Regions:
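Conserved Rossmann-fold NAD(P)-dependent oxidoreductase catalytic core, especially the SDR/UDP-sugar
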Residues: 8, 35, 84, 89-132, ...
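NAD(P)H-binding glycine-rich loop region in Rossmannoid oxidoreductase-like domains
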Residues: 46-97, 101-104, 198
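Oxidoreductase cofactor-interface core, primarily capturing Rossmann-like NAD(P)-dependent enzymes
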Residues: 24, 120-217
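N-terminal Rossmann NAD(P)H-binding glycine-rich loop of SDR-like oxidoreductase domains
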Residues: 3-25
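Structural motif
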Residues: 4, 67-68, 109
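Short, polar loop motifs at secondary-structure junctions
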Residues: 32-40
Length: 217
């Protein structure tokens, strides 16, 4: 397997857990962490590349042939002042440019975090957008693309989200009533499953829901 992984999105709940897993995983020698500003996590494995996420050429410079690429990129409505156009620039445009660079530079695989319920025909803005980016990336016909669809993530964020904090306390109490795809899941388990699946020689497109994720932790 390739000893180099390129990680886009290393500070969020899942991204930070992915970085921890990669640092302690002997199968990877080099972690290219691509960010907007310098990372604070220290490791001999880490090489930090700061790029302009709005420029496609920036992605092409840091993604190399054969790289394993992982993306855990996203924003929130509050961060973009509830501007749907700005939200789309992050959750759709950035990820699509990243995927295009994977295609043109012949990356071995792309794994990214989507959402349970993602559907381009959904009336919900968030789920519709997630479905649209999934469809757009699938149309690129990458060598290998792993799409992870967790529901509510359990774990401690660096930032405070009141609504999510309440949901994290309440939803697990009723998870036995939910369909498995929509059950809350630990962010660390999602991260472990992504890192583990990246080591396999998967071909084409594969979706991972709640049960699928827990099977490969």
């Amino acid at each position: 397997m390739n000893k180099t992984v390129a990680l886009f999105g290393s500070t969020g709940l899942i991204g930070s857990e992915i970085l921890k897993q990669l640092i302690h995983d002997d199968d990877y020698e080099t972690i290219n962490v691509i960010t907007r500003k310098k990372v604070t996590v220290q490791s001999k494995k880490i090489k930090n590349y700061i790029i302009d996420f709005t420029n496609l050429d920036g992605y092409k410079k840091v993604i190399k042939k054969g790289d394993v690429v992982i993306a855990s990129i996203g924003t929130t409505q509050s961060k973009v002042n509830f501007n749907k156009s700005e939200y789309r620039k992050v959750d759709y445009n950035i990820l699509l440019n990243l995927a295009k660079a994977c295609k043109s530079n012949d990356a071995s695989s792309l794994s990214f975090v989507s959402s349970a319920g993602a559907n381009a025909k959904n009336k919900n803005f968030y789920l519709k957008l997630k479905g649209e980016i999934e469809n757009s990336i699938i149309q690129l016909d990458l060598k290998s693309c792993l799409i992870f669809r967790p529901s509510l993530l359990l774990g401690k964020r660096n930032e405070f989200r009141f609504g999510e904090m309440i949901a994290q306390k309440i939803m697990p109490l009723f998870s036995f009533l939910m369909k498995s795809d929509y059950k809350p899941i630990k962010a660390v388990d999602v991260a472990k499953s992504i890192v583990n699946e990246c080591k396999k020689k998967n071909k084409g497109y594969k979706f991972y829901h709640f049960d699928d994720i827990l099977k490969v932790v």
